[in-house]
Amino acid sequence: GMARKRPSRTGGTVVVLEHRSKILADNPLGDPAQRKLGVWLPHEYDSDSTHGRGRRFPVLYDLVGFTGTGIAHLNWKPFSENVAERAARLVRDQRMGPAIIVFPDCFTSLGGNQYVNSSAIGNYADFLLDEVIPLVDREFRTLASRDHRGCFGKSSGGYGAMIHGMKYAAHWGAIANHSGDACFDFIYRADWPNTLNELGNFRRPPRKAGRYQNRADSVDDGRLAQGLDDGRVRRFLDAMWKKQKLTPGEGHALMNVCMAATYDPDPAAPNGFRLPFHMETGALLPQRWKRWLQHDPVLLVDKYAANLRRLKGIYV
């Protein structure tokens, strides 16, 4: 039973590797290049008479959601299963064949990752494809081809799986997208008023009650109309990085700032990215939003239809 959890003899093995990434070295946020990589090996990996020598296994990559970490999916959970325990049960019940499951760490100072390349965050797609996959194929007995390699994830991880299936079908044979970010007009746009309020707390000088006029011809307005930070985003980030605990509003604001850095990076802009809304008036900036929509899976299906057809499996 769930309440009396005991280690299972057929639960497989968890291995944690530490590796230093060349691709994440000197990333713009100063996030660590040294990363932990969780790997779950099924019971069958070591169980047969030759200690599994020679037998190779397919590999699944677990892309975690925003604010998540790969290793956390291996944590002990009372009254529930972690991902490794669930996989062990599914293999034991013959609902799934034995496979190696990999838990990459793609966490960033902006609270998470969409598993794509961004000049404002780092090249996390390259990190996965050019470093993590070859490392796993080198260290473990894998079936080292796209036909035996898949990725799955929820939320940001679902987005990552979808985009990887679209853009990088040479590396992946199947993808599973659980509640991945899509239809940006619907999911992101309505969330920005809260974010503009949170960022407004870091406006200098602070906003006072009373009549307020935004002068459309001012220098400040010109910069804000281009989605450039007037300092409040920088102050917001510096404040968030010092806090022990974020409020729900701050957490959502951090997420939206992370999405701006993901979808509209600009090395020449303050902080390395632009914002999709005018931070004083709250007006959507159509030129900036166009850049976001270039990353919306709903609008990319036709462009990447040939790659999607190459996949053996797509779960949405």
PLM regions with names:
Residues 1-315:
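Non-catalytic cap/lid and distal C-terminal segments of serine-dependent acyl enzymes
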